[in-house]
């Protein structure tokens, strides 16, 4: 039976949704035969993964004026490679791959590109940049959408350039624009890249629960363990002795899970035409915004069958090479417990071949003395790699998040054990507190809502004798509602390494 804890458990777990009757309480909580403890055992191994709260609350929150879509701009780099369409000799004949060298004796010839990107007087280079530099001789002549440039070889090369270096697809970039010392004229130009406008939608969620009015003072024969949040943010273990305490806690706990799931895993329900395809009971469109994972996965995503440290290093260099300073290359990688073990084993493989690597017990404390009845000189041994320093200032630090190991939401199992999602690695450039790259969004003045409908008695608040009854039934309904959003400013600064078994 699912959720059965071996032969010592007398009954399986009982589950129900919605209104709780006296029969539920009597069957589950009220009957109290002799027990070893008056507290229920918290079963961490089944059905409830940990909340995403600690993960999402590590991001700052930014306020917006209203509930309209929120927009932001991502500006790309103006440094680009332009692929060659074709080359033509000085007579205008297309240069074939088996043709003789072109530009012999600094004779001019023509390069054709798909857009007008280069300027008069600039030196441009192809794949073999320093070997064959070319100088632009005048502005481009447009042929439809193609730009034709007259060029000559730059430098002391009089032998020309091999035709194989002038074939379609060779990529060219700008070097500089040299001029003579005296009486020089204008050359060169400046290029710009327009920002790409990004947008996301707010997600509004609700939850409700109905309780009979007579549950107001229902006590439990045994306490229900729960975790309570203090105003300081600290979590403490507590025990609910009244049924309504437990109901209130479950409402908040499950609504909190709604919120976190929407911000982390939410998917936009807008199609390519900007239309929303889902409608609520009112007939109005339901709008859901993209969560963190959907926003990051549009950028850099790699699926892997075999994990290696080189795979991870390659991913990190993609994010940092020529983009981040050497002292700004600390990456925090979110993963599960299985991913952390896999990371440790791969680092261990790498360092095990280092001849200078010595387990100096004075500094690493790999072996320590412990107390044990088994031996008078008992020792403990072990270590785990949680950080790796790669070349060029790249540092990798692991952060294990419990929701990667959640067996309820993550249903696909991995051949090596555990859920497959636990082997996922999310490399996120978080940014700074002044300019975060990932943050939660909030509408100014629009806090979460909590309201009640009730008849004669309201067991949620303890009120009795309602002179303005919402309905004649002796019950109460709690409603919770919130509008949420999350923003990843620049998804290209993030990367995900995902087990291939999770590829859809």
Curated annotation (Swiss-Prot):
Subcellular location: Virion
The entry's keywords: Capsid protein, Virion
The keyword Zinc-finger appears for this protein: no
Protein name: Major capsid protein
Organism superkingdom: Viruses
Ion transport found in the keyword field: no
GO annotation, cellular component aspect: viral capsid
Note: Displays an HK-97-like fold with an insertion domain that protrudes at the capsid surface.
Known role: Capsid protein self-assembles to form an icosahedral capsid, with a T=9 symmetry, about 77 nm in diameter. Each asymmetric capsid nonamer is covered by 9 capsid auxiliary protein, 1 copy of the trimeric head fiber protein and 2 copies of the dimeric head fiber protein.
Principal cellular location given in the protein's record: virion
UniProt-listed InterPro entries: Crass_capsid
The organism of origin for this protein: Bacteroides phage crAss001 (Bacteroides phage PhiCrAss001)
Subunit note: Interacts with the auxiliary capsid protein (via FD region). Interacts with the head fiber dimeric protein. Interacts with the head fiber trimeric protein. Interacts with the portal vertex auxiliary protein.
């Amino acid at each position: 039976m699912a959720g059965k804890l071996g032969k010592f458990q007398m009954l399986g777990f009982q589950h129900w949704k919605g209104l709780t009757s006296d029969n539920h309480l009597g069957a589950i909580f009220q009957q109290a035969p002799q027990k070893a403890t008056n507290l229920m055992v918290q079963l961490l191994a089944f059905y409830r993964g940990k909340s995403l709260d600690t993960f999402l609350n590590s991001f700052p929150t930014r306020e917006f004026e209203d509930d309209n879509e929120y927009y932001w701009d991502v500006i790309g780099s103006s440094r680009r490679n332009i692929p060659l369409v074709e080359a033509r000799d000085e007579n205008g004949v297309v240069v074939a791959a088996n043709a003789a060298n072109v530009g012999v004796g600094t004779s001019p010839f023509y390069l054709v590109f798909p857009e007008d990107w280069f300027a008069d007087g600039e030196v441009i280079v192809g794949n073999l940049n320093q070997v064959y530099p070319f100088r632009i001789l005048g502005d481009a002549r447009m042929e439809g959408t193609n730009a034709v440039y007259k060029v000559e070889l730059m430098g002391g090369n009089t032998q020309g350039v091999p035709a194989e270096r002038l074939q379609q697809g060779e990529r060219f970039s700008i070097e500089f624009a040299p001029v003579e010392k005296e009486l020089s004229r204008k050359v060169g130009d400046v290029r710009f890249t327009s920002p790409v406008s990004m947008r996301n939608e707010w997600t509004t969620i609700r939850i409700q629960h109905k309780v009979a009015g007579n549950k107001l003072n229902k006590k439990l024969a045994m306490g229900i363990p729960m975790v309570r949040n203090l105003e300081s943010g600290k979590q403490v273990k507590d025990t609910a002795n009244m049924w309504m305490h437990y109901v209130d806690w479950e409402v908040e706990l499950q609504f909190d899970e709604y919120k976190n799931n929407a911000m982390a895993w939410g998917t936009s329900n807008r199609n390519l035409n900007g239309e929303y395809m889902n409608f609520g009971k009112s007939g109005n469109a339901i709008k859901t915004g993209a969560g963190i994972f959907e926003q990051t996965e549009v950028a850099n995503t790699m699926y892997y069958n075999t994990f290696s440290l080189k795979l991870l290093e390659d991913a990190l260099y993609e994010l940092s090479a020529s983009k981040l300073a050497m002292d700004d290359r600390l990456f925090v990688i979110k993963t599960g417990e299985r991913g952390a073990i896999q990371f440790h084993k791969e680092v261990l493989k790498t360092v095990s071949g280092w001849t200078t690597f010595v387990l100096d017990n004075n500094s690493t404390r790999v072996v320590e003395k412990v107390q044990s009845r088994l031996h008078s000189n008992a020792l403990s041994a072990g270590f785990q790699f949680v950080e790796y320093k790669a070349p060029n200032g790249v540092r990798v630090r692991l952060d294990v998040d419990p929701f990667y190991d959640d067996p309820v939401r993550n249903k696909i199992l991995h051949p090596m054990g555990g859920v497959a999602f636990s082997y996922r690695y999310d490399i996120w450039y978080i940014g700074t507190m002044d300019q975060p790259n990932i943050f939660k969004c909030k509408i100014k003045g629009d806090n979460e809502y909590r309201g009640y409908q009730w008849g004669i008695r309201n067991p949620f608040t303890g009120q009795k004798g309602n002179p303005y009854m919402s309905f004649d039934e002796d019950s109460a309904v709690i409603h919770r509602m919130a509008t949420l959003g999350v923003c990843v400013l620049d998804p290209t600064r993030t990367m995900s390494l995902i087990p291939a078994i999770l590829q859809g």
